[in-house]
Design a protein with these regions (language model features):
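N-terminal amphipathic/basic leader segments beginning at the initiator methionine
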Residues: 1-28
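Glycine-rich phosphate/pyrophosphate-binding loop regions near the starts of catalytic domains
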Residues: 19-133
């Protein structure tokens, strides 16, 4: 079995990344890099990962995916703040049945959330999984 037979459209994925790079030029590689700004003495980087959980059910019912990305960034940023750290960067993971307009709305929300939080989107993954509901 190959990617296409499993329902993954590699060309759509590449196109999606290129579109996102226009708004977040640091993404696209296999690892996110972040340069610690000058002025930090003995910096310790704090990272956090969270999810939106059952809120995706609300998006499905409302047929509105425009704010869930903002919520995702907020969950992660808030966790970092509770550690007494300043959020600096964000990495995302989006798993979907198919890369489509809903995923684009989620990503626009993630970019907006990053802007509101003052963090940079430095990378992540958008994965197609045809068996996902």
């Amino acid at each position: 079995m190959n990617y296409k037979d499993s329902g993954v459209d590699l060309e759509a994925g590449r196109s999606f990344v290129e579109t996102l790079k226009e708004k977040a030029p640091s993404i696209g590689g296999f690892g996110g890099m972040f340069e610690v700004p000058r002025g930090y003495e003995e910096p310790v980087l704090v990272s956090g990962t969270d999810g939106v959980g059952t809120k995706m059910n609300i998006c499905r019912v409302a047929r509105d995916y425009t704010t869930i990305g903002i919520d995702l960034v907020a969950m992660c940023v808030n966790d970092i703040i509770t550690c007494g750290a300043k959020p600096l960067y964000f990495l995302d993971y989006v798993s979907t049945r198919k890369i489509d307009d809903k995923v684009a709305d989620i990503m626009v929300g993630i970019l907006k959330g990053c802007e509101l939080a003052g963090v940079k989107l430095i990378g992540g993954e958008t994965a197609e999984n045809f068996r996902q509901r």
